[in-house]
Design a protein with these regions (language model features):
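Phosphate-binding site recognition
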Residues: 1-330, 334
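A cross-kingdom feature that marks ATP-driven nucleic-acid transaction machinery
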Residues: 293, 302-465
Length: 465
């Protein structure tokens, strides 16, 4: 399955702008491995294209690479290409090429180029304003550093601010899009594939599930020779100068530490140091910072792993390292990995259920403003509680309250009573609509409560309909 699969909407929009024959500056960004370059390559098929992939090196070496890209386009039969003396000269050559004919110019890994040649954004701004705006140039700037792309390309402080004609933030596939890769597998298997890969097309392909998720994990992840086994370490080495500390932070979060103090204690560094590293992990799309829905960032803020593949890897690979090294993982897998998958899938299932409600937002009893989790203290019982799903209204005081259970047991009426109690602790609404999601189904008592209109019940199979 190709990596641009399920990117038809983005591809259609890119092609529509190409047909316009006027200057375009398209910004494409998103975390690594999500399929940005595959999307661009698919779009560029059959179109006159100069594709320049910037290098994490010096400005001079990037100029050499850019020169080669341009000369390869102009004279594909040349064995060696002359180098432009300056970036201005290279950009002027691109101006000449796009003056009369439509041409695509891609700068992939743009943050690398901007780091190597800090003036490049200002140079592009100048040539766009004075030459390319009247040309047939179709410029694509692509990058994986999301904070850089948002601040230094799209942000108001950037020289390029206002020059873009469109931008695409490429996100991982959702659970339904991920399932299209394996239409013959069960809903449970497809949910596991989503939970392991996070909907990243590259990881879906590398996991390569044929008949069994268990077999695919043993062959393509829990094996030292496999691509996915080495992926986290390779990605951290590629992106970061001090992978050891980042590695410790990711491992701490994967093991359940979510508050800054807890992470700091596990890592053994100061809060200020860990905060700095967390910011970088958030920028890379590996970690995320979350606050209870409808509340401002503060003491309740927690850190989670945004990348499901990293979360899975750090949850199950380090603790099974000796079994992997000794070749015993196939024997230990049932009781060291498989039995813990339902627990691991808990957070994943919550996200799937939230996405389900967003899919069918027009059928909900309220006009949905946002959806997320809420956690806080039950002052009467003096304990912490968490509500898996809270849907807030655009206006009024009607809320959606939901519970998500990824387990084989049927869920009973006691779960409805529990989320009613939680709703009263939440306390922001005067009317609540209750939703319970369950992989294992529901008891007769809870089904009867649904018949009385007290609750909406959704199974795993319902999510995939």
């Amino acid at each position: 399955m190709s990596q641009f699969y399920c990117r038809e909407n983005e591809l259609r929009k890119l092609n529509k702008r190409y047909e316009g024959d006027k200057f375009e500056c398209i910004v494409i960004y998103g975390r690594r491995r999500v399929g940005k370059t595959a999307l661009i390559n698919e779009f560029c098929k059959g179109k006159p294209t100069i594709f320049f992939s910037a290098l994490n090196t010096t400005g001079k070496e990037n100029l050499e690479a850019l020169s080669k890209s341009i000369m390869t386009f102009e004279r594909p039969d040349m064995e060696s290409a002359p180098e432009f003396r300056s970036y201005d000269a290279a950009l002027d050559e691109l101006t000449a090429l796009s003056k009369e004919k439509r041409m695509v110019f891609v700068i992939d890994e743009y943050p690398y180029l901007a780091k190597a040649k800090p003036a490049i954004s200002a140079m592009l701004q100048h040539i766009i304003d004075h030459k390319w705006m009247e040309s047939k140039m179709y410029l694509i700037l692509c990058g994986s550093s999301m904070s850089f792309m948002e601040s230094q390309v799209l942000g108001k402080e950037s020289p390029l601010y206002g020059r873009r004609t469109a931008q695409f933030k490429i996100a991982p596939l959702d659970y339904k899009e991920t399932a299209v890769f394996h239409p013959n597998l069960s809903d449970e298997d497809n949910s596991l594939i989503y939970g392991i890969t996070g909907g990243v097309p590259h990881y879906i392909n590398k996991l390569d599930v044929r008949d069994s998720v268990d077999e695919a994990l043993l062959d393509n992840l829990f094996d030292r020779s496999s691509y996915l086994y080495e992926e986290p370490a390779n990605l951290l080495k590629q992106e970061l100068r001090e992978p050891a500390i980042y590695n410790a932070i990711i491992k701490a979060i994967a093991e359940g530490a979510s508050r800054l103090n807890d992470i700091t204690m596990k890592v053994g560094e100061e809060n200020s140091v860990v905060s700095k590293y967390l910011k970088t992990l958030i920028d890379l799309g590996i970690a995320k910072k979350e606050t209870p829905i409808s509340e401002k960032p503060g003491k309740k803020t927690i850190y989670l792993l945004a990348d499901n593949f990293f979360r899975f890897w750090y949850r199950f690979v380090p603790v099974n390292m000796s079994a992997i090294d000794s070749g015993r993982i196939a024997k230990t897998y049932p009781h060291t990995v498989k039995q813990y998958l339902p627990d691991y899938m808990g957070l994943i299932f919550e996200k799937m259920c939230q996405d389900y409600l967003l899919y069918y937002a027009d059928k909900l009893p309220i006009e949905l403003n946002e959806i997320g989790q809420w956690w806080g203290t039950d002052s009467k019982k003096k304990k912490q509680i968490q509500i898996d799903i809270v849907g807030t209204p655009v206006e009024g005081k009607e809320y959606i309250i939901g519970s998500c259970k990824y387990r084989n047991e049927k869920i009973g009426v006691d779960e409805l009573e529990l989320i009613r109690d939680y709703a009263s602790v939440f306390g922001k609404g005067n009317t609540y609509h209750y939703y319970i999601f369950s992989k294992g189904g529901f008891t007769d008592g809870l089904l009867q409560a649904r018949e009385r209109g007290e609750v909406q019940l959704i199974t795993l199979e319902d999510l995939y309909k």
